[in-house]
Curated annotation (Swiss-Prot):
Domain of life: Bacteria
Name of the protein in its database record: Trans-3-hydroxy-L-proline dehydratase
Annotated source species: Paracoccus denitrificans (strain Pd 1222)
Catalytic activity: trans-3-hydroxy-L-proline = 1-pyrroline-2-carboxylate + H2O
EC identifiers of the protein: 4.2.1.77
Length: 342
């Protein structure tokens, strides 16, 4: 076969959300920190387009690039590439990356528990993997500091009028809205409508509220998280959510950074404290088991350290290639599957 490059990928999903992992064929990008490297990837776009655009990718796909860690405490660094963003952190992608590292032997597995430190762009995370029979069966992530930003803010949204929302950060930035308050249900047959409405709400929140992280230059709201009311059983809170990811899709997983952001809001409202547990349930009924590890301060801002726990499965391996004569070496996007006007 004729090809000008070969990129080695292990395909994976965490509780339904695709998080492929590049394990070879791509050199680490320039940058003194993993954050700097992620900004280079975001600006350059060459790799993003190659792996995310059709015919190799699609709006449903996230791709993670393994890089050598910059912090000596970490065993591996990685950069997350999502359809619209190159974010600081992702819970489902962290679970995919940890699973791939262990299941493929890149990092040696220790049964029954393997502990490691990983370095996404947003800061170090501690990982504990339950392992059995050569498989990482469940990944527990101690996430980056997470915080509520605005509570009960009011914004104007086209087609909805004035709505009340919260904004928060859980490794990425969210606007949170009660699904019923905007006439929506969190159900598979509502996914298209949730995605389209969520992108509109995200745009309005960015225009009218904005966001700025106190310790890095992340300065926009990435996602809209629709929530259903909480229930409680045996002291554990349960809550369904659906996160609309730009340019217009719904996360299949419960969204680890979204669960972290929701717990930060619940903590700010006095509904959760360190040690309390929360189970986030996705639109396809998969779950992340979460809790608040402790309270921290982030450049003067009150924050929490969330814990996210979930499962991932390796579903394949592949080699991405490009023929020198291929007219679509950087891929393409069409609005039938990649919304462009939301």
């Amino acid at each position: 076969m004729r090809t000008s490059r070969v990129v080695h990928v292990v395909s994976c999903h965490a509780e339904g959300e695709v998080g492929d992992v590049i394990v070879g064929g791509v050199a680490p990008p320039p940058g003194e920190t993993v954050w700097d490297q992620s900004r280079w990837i975001a600006r350059d776009e060459t790799l993003r387009n190659f792996v995310l655009n059709e015919p190799r990718g699609g709006v449903f796909r996230h791709v993670n690039l393994l890089v050598p860690p910059k912090d000596p405490r970490a065993q591996m660094g990685w950069i997350i590439m999502e359809p619209a963003d190159t974010p600081p952190m992702s819970g489902s992608n962290a679970i995919c990356v940890a699973t791939v590292l262990l299941d493929t032997g890149i990092i040696p597995m220790q049964e029954p528990i393997t502990r490691m430190v990983l370095e996404p762009p947003g800061g170090l995370i501690e990982v504990e993997a339950e392992c059995r029979g050569g498989k990482a069966e469940r990944i527990r992530v101690r996430n980056v500091p997470s915080f509520a930003d605005r509570l009960d803010a009011r914004i104007e949204v086209e087609g909805l009028g004035t709505i009340t929302v919260d904004t928060a950060y859980g490794g990425d930035s969210f606007v949170l809205v009660d699904a019923a308050s905007v006439g929506m249900r969190i159900a598979p047959d509502q996914a298209r409508d949730l995605a389209e409405m969520g992108v509109r709400i995200t745009r309005a929140a960015n225009e009218q509220l904005g966001f700025r992280h106190p310790a890095n230059d992340w300065s926009h709201i990435s996602f809209c998280q629709f929530t259903d009311p909480l229930s409680e059983r045996d002291g554990v809170l349960y809550g369904r959510n659906a996160v609309a990811i730009r340019p217009g899709k719904i996360d299949r997983s419960p969204t680890g950074t979204g669960c972290s952001a929701r717990m930060a809001v619940l903590h700010a409202r006095g509904r959760m404290k360190p040690g309390d547990r929360f189970v986030g349930r996705s639109i396809i009924d998969t779950e992340f088991h979460c809790s608040i590890a402790d309270e921290v301060e982030l450049n003067g801002k009150r924050a929490i350290r969330p814990i996210i726990s979930g499962r991932a499965w390796v579903i394949g391996t592949k080699q991405l290639m490009v023929d020198p004569d291929d007219p679509f070496q950087n891929g393409y996007r069409l609005s039938d599957t990649w919304p462009m006007d939301l």
